[in-house]
Amino acid sequence: MKYFLLLFLLVLSFTLVESVYQYQILILEPIYRFTDSAAVPAKSIYFTNLPQHFSLTQKSSKLDLSQFNVVRGFTQEMFLKNLGCGTDTCQNFPATVTSVYNIIDLKGRLKFETNPAGTDNVLGKAGYLATEEIEGLVRYDEYYSEEDDSFTYTNGKYPNQFGACQLRDYGKLRYKFVRTLGHAFTAVAIPENLPIYSIFAYDDGLPEPTTTVSPTLSPTQYVFETNPIWKILKNSKNGTQGVGAVNLPWTPPVSASPIEPTNVCLLNGNSSVLSRYGEIDRMLQFFDDTHVIIGFKDSIQDASNTFIYSYIGYAFKSSDNLCGIPLKPIRELYKAGVGNTVVAGDDYSDLISSGYMLTGNIIGYTIDCNSTTDGELIVMIPDGISTISSTTILLTSQFATSSPSQIVGYYVQPVKIVGPSASGGEQGYWVDPELPEPQIGDVLGISNVCLFTASSSIISKCGYTRNIYVYYDNVDKFYFVSLYTFGRSVTSKVIGIAFETEENSCGLNLVPIRELYKDRYYVVAGNDYQYLIDDGYNITGNIVGYTVDCKDSKDEFVYGHLPSYAFSTTTSSMTTTASDSTTSDSSVIVSSSKNPAVSNPFITTYSLPSSPNNPFISITTTPDSASSQKISTTTAISHSAYSASPSTIPTTTPYDLTKPLPKLDCNIIENYGDLNGRMVNFANVMEVGDNITITGHIWQNASESTFNLYVGMDPKYLQSYISIHINMRWATDGIVYNYFWGMWNYQFESYSTRPFSRGLPYVLSVVRGINYYDVYGNGQFIKKFGIIGSVALHQVGAMYGYQQWNIDTVKMNCARSHTTTVEPSTPLETASTSQSTPSATLTSTTENIPSTSKIPETSTTQRPTSPILTSGATSTSSSTESTTTSPTTSTTTTLPPTTTPYNLSAPIPKLDCNTIQFYGNLLWRPVVFSRYMEVGDNITLTGFIWNNATESNVNFYLGFNPLFGTTAVPVHISQRWSSSARIIYNNFWGQWGPEAFSARPFTRGQPFVISLIKTANSHQIYGNGQLLINFGYRGTASQNLIGSMIAYRESTIDTVSMACVRPPTTPTTTTSTTTTTTPKLTTTSTLPSTSTAIATTDVSTRPRSCDINSITLGEGDANTPQLQLDAVLGESSGSSLSIYCRGLPNYSIYMMFNVNQGGPPPVIDGYLEITLDCLPDSEGVWTFGGREITAISCFQAPKCSTFVPSFWRSVDLPILSPTSRVVMLLTWQ
């Protein structure tokens, strides 16, 4: 949920005054775009009411509306819906609005109009726009094309002025800015079958007392004003009571009056200072049909007919704070017929005696009003907590290369405006760090626009960035600066890097790059452009990008936070106590005394060197390592009496984002971070039989994910021709295919099914045929796309993936070898590694290239629980560790990789000192260990954090039967992305304990590695290779016997690994899946064949002969309490399958087999589990006690009576003995 806030600060005699924010829900009217797909180029019109368009079947003399036959959906900008609106007011919006109409003008052109003329044909009111610029609203501009004689509408915030599809539709049209109609709204939620709405926050103009810094206080003391929460009588039909602020500055929709104050006092003051004490948030006041309540903004997320009324103060989200503030829980109480009230702390006996009951809801934490003095709270900041914002720290351009830094400098240079040279010519722009002065003319001046000129791969981690060009229009003979060509015939030169929007994650103060015009001269400026207006320039209305103002730079650097990098995971062996690694040389190199559970000697450290002589930021690694001749390591353990045998502690190596991408030359590009939005150029054009494969993750909130194969070498995005365009539109079920040859031809759009899912990994492959492409998704053939036009012209030389997915690797498998020298495709050296592991594994890859083969065949065998080893050959030893690095790269030819989908139907095996992977997203799936964690054991999770994550959690449970919300949790790890930059740790033993905190090294939209290591009296948690916290035991050692885990909320879990100090006592059981993908090509070209074996363990199991999907499981009903329960699949070991059902603790649980057949004896403890057998002679049928089982249903009843459905008449219970059979007559009680 997005809130737009207007800050209004008054500083008067040491008093900071912060205004009250009013929150209001606004219902919006979406604007739909309709396109005439037959027009070349495509034309579009805009309507705000979808049925209205279809009702206009009549043909105007100037305009045939029926020809606009393609609905492009609604735009990002929306009008205020016409609900209770007047001349200049609508929905109580606190600013002046103006009406907007759909009209057809005298020339027969459809457009929006705020003041229709008498000659205009008014079709209907479209909605309302705000008349003034307010933060949170977007400018709504009108553009006109002379070529097309039509109007189009968009906002002035985006540099290309149109969305991607609109820009393609209008690629050959030149639209000129006409006017700004007003300011439009954007939606924060688009629910199904509900109104589209936005939440708007505005300053009410009334001062609210906040932090007062008295001259008598020390610099570390702050005063916060407090205000009590009042009981409020809501004057509705039943006159129920609520709670909220006593001073209501605005009249609510239903009037209310105060009764008396509670002892709950909220804080008001400088939130940036207050947030240094602990996790705080705004407390809001809500109202519904009958009540007035308080809570944080997320407390009504799923409530209906509940509205935000006003902001009333700050409260803490937990009882922990760093300054000793006596926080009390804000408890909610309720009395039937009266309503709600609240109390701070445990003193509520008088309310209980008067008929109130605790609801169990803890709204937040604040102080008791009795803790204040004259309504003020004085807080002293302890040593070590800075009260100065990091943005006020004086930064210099000198960075120490030996120490890591969170603040980095980004190299920028100003755009210089260049006039005609003496020999004639046109005015242009110049920025080039390699040349001291421009060579094309005289410098007229230096603009206040500074562009980034460092590596785009680094600055792109701050937000959406692209190369910005100076273009020369070959037709109209003028220069202009932009991120895109707007379909013009141009020549271009890259002059820097700019952002597409003003949003960034590095704390950079971005300003719009505004375009101004005078006498065929186009110039750019930031927010300060008055001097150009005075010189006769006019604003064109175009914003061509976002960058920094030169006044914010210092010595050609601007400073911001280091963006979070993608990480690749490597493992290094834990140091063993008194262990030796020996080679032929017997000399001792190093002796170390490091606790493996505390510090990892092999963790890579990073430094960020930067100097004026080398302005480009680079990442270097400084491994703590020595020669590998002989290493004698002695481990001194100060607090735990155990010896760590070889295991794995994850380390994290950042992708080298400073290197430009190499050309893809029949190899793989990986370890360069997210390749989304980066053009991957090929060393040679694609040939028949070549296969391009990409892998990665699809965002959980993705709306579109797109893949293009471009024609030509070194193509340009939105300019060059596209041979095949693959577009996944997640609002629909399929994939759209097309091509782009100067324009989109929607008549050639085709479709296929989509095997991918949001939030999960994917594998997408495209194989080139003679006159077609074969497309594979997750191992399935999904589309044969015929090449359109002359095949000889489709010389594909690059690929480009963009929009809402991550691209981790791009690989090309070629049908024939190329003679070119292959450069290393990754910045990491190819290594052959020998290391100590619990069990030996040998992996080899053999390529057989026959003389003739017409079909590229690839066969891959995967073992889901065995790790993939990327080295060419791996051997193991019980006491050695050595690494040999080969700096050379040889040219090899491989064939298309298999695209094996994850086996999402296979039950998850027990984690037995191994790795669970290839089971899709393990989120919400219980992972049960084969034994309790022992001292020195390490559990490691790898995965990906969603881009829109609000919370990502992991629970490590007591025992082997994790019940979410019930089973004890010795270690709970919570990342709350929307409210804190910390990680929260806790335990659950019937109730939550006190919270602990650490820094958070993870970032939304990036991969992560998190590990938990057990010691004698604590659990140590590592994140991306860093020790985050030493979390001491809560309770006894027996209360910290971790045997299972569940990860939940917004993340993707790819692997869960367990590294054990003691080898497993039972052979490792591996569940295997085998998939063979054969792309069929109707070509006579000679293609090689490759057989690849992926690393497997040496123990395999007999394939299961019974299908787990053959059992029909009953579902629970909606009664309270339930009578019928869910029957749930449990574990499967191949020859057995567990089924369980769970009910209330004091109820009896019954199971029914097949159709009205008795099941096992009932149980009284609320949990019933059985095991079905799949015997060798059962012919693929699950059995229980020799009986064939096809369906199972579960029921519960109070144990004190026989409570079963009336349709049960007589029930056969299972055979209890060979000679006895029990029959019970059950009736409705």
From Swiss-Prot:
Signal peptide: 1-19
GO molecular function terms noted in the UniProt entry: carbohydrate binding
Keyword Nucleotide-binding tagged: no
Pfam family membership, one: Gal-bind_lectin
Domain of life: Eukaryota
Sites where a glycan is attached: 238, 270, 370, 538, 691, 701, 903, 938, 948, 1146
Xref: PROSITE patterns: GALECTIN (PS51304)
Disulfide bond sites: none
Presence of keyword Repeat: yes
Biased composition (Low complexity): 830-846, 870-901, 1067-1087
Domain Galectin: 678-813, 925-1059
InterPro entries documented for this protein: C6_domain, ConA-like_dom_sf, Galectin-like, Galectin_CRD
Protein name: Putative uncharacterized protein F40H6.5
